[in-house]
C-alpha cells in the first residue's frame, strides 16, 4: 500500500460494505464514497446536504443488506441504497447510537432503546433491565449491556 493515496485525510466516518468494500463520509465536501476491495471508487454521492435537503453532521454509519444508514442526531437516520441513492429519513432524532439488524433498526435515544420497524414504520420501546450501562448491543436474541466492570447478557424477545 506504499504510495497509495485515496485522498481520505479528512474522512470523518467509515463502515464496511458488501463484497469487501467500504463507505467513507467526507464532512468537508459532504460526500459519500464507496470503495471496492481493490480500493477503486465504485459509487460517489456529492453534496449530501443538497441531496437530503438539510445540513447534516452524521456521527455513525452502518451498512446492512446493501442499505447504508447515516445516524444524524439532529434529523434522524438517513437511508441510502447500495448505489448511494437517497431513499428515506427515519425521523427519530437524538440517537447516540444505532444498530441495524434483520428485524429492525435499534436506536439508543436519551438512555432509551427504541426499535424501528422499516416495514410497518412503527417504533416500540425496549425496556432495559438496568440503568447503569456504557453501551448496548443486540445479537442473536440476546441483549448485551456493557458496564464498567461487567457485561450483562439478557434474553431478548424483540
Task: Put a short name on every predicted segment.
Residues 130-158:
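Blade-level signature of beta-propeller repeat domains, shared across WD40, Kelch, NHL, RCC1
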Residues 1-6, 40-53, 83-90, 121-128:
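A short beta-strand motif characteristic of beta-propeller blades
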Residues 36-40, 80-85, 117-121, 156-158:
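Short loop/turn segments that connect beta-strands within beta-propeller blades
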Residues 27-29, 72-73, 110, 148-150:
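Short loop/turn segments immediately following the C-termini of beta-strands
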Residues 31-33, 78, 114, 152-153:
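WD40 beta-propeller blade core
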Residues 70-75, 80, 87-115:
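Loop/turn-rich, solvent-exposed surfaces of beta-rich toroidal or solenoidal domains
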Residues 22-24, 67-70, 104-107, 142-145:
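Conserved beta-propeller blade signature
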Residues 7-19, 52-65, 92-103, 130-141:
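Repeated scaffold domains used in trafficking and secretory/extracellular systems
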